[in-house]
Swiss-Prot record:
GO terms for molecular function: quinone binding. Keywords: PQQ biosynthesis. Disulfide bonds: none annotated. One of its GO terms (biological process) is pyrroloquinoline quinone biosynthetic process. This is PqqA binding protein. Monomer. Interacts with PqqE. Pathway: Cofactor biosynthesis; pyrroloquinoline quinone biosynthesis. It comes from Acinetobacter baumannii (strain AYE).
Length: 94
């Protein structure tokens, strides 16, 4: 799937064995999985907070725009994150 074909009605869910959380020792959000940990940058952490298995990508974009203002790049940033996260097997898109 590429960015032009991406369906913002898809709902991202964390894959089994992957857990998103704030890690004080890392001073940021991380994804924990059986083999280790991925430290997320601030933007990825902001997006990850809204992945709850009920919000579709469009709703996540709307919530981030409400939180940070109507920044045009938010749409592309969220879609890029979803594509990378799916490619890395962190999330499923259903």
């Amino acid at each position: 799937m590429n960015k032009e074909q991406f369906d913002v009605n898809l709902v991202p869910t964390w894959r089994q064995g992957y857990r998103f959380q704030f890690e004080p020792a890392q001073n940021g959000f991380v994804i924990l999985y059986p083999e280790g940990m991925i430290k997320l940058n601030e933007s990825a952490g902001a997006i990850g907070q809204y992945i709850d298995g009920t919000n579709n990508v469009s709703a996540i974009i709307a919530q981030l725009k409400q939180q940070f203002g109507d920044i045009p790049e938010i749409d592309n940033d969220v879609i890029d994150y979803m594509l990378v996260a799916q490619q890395q097997h962190w999330i499923d898109l259903v």
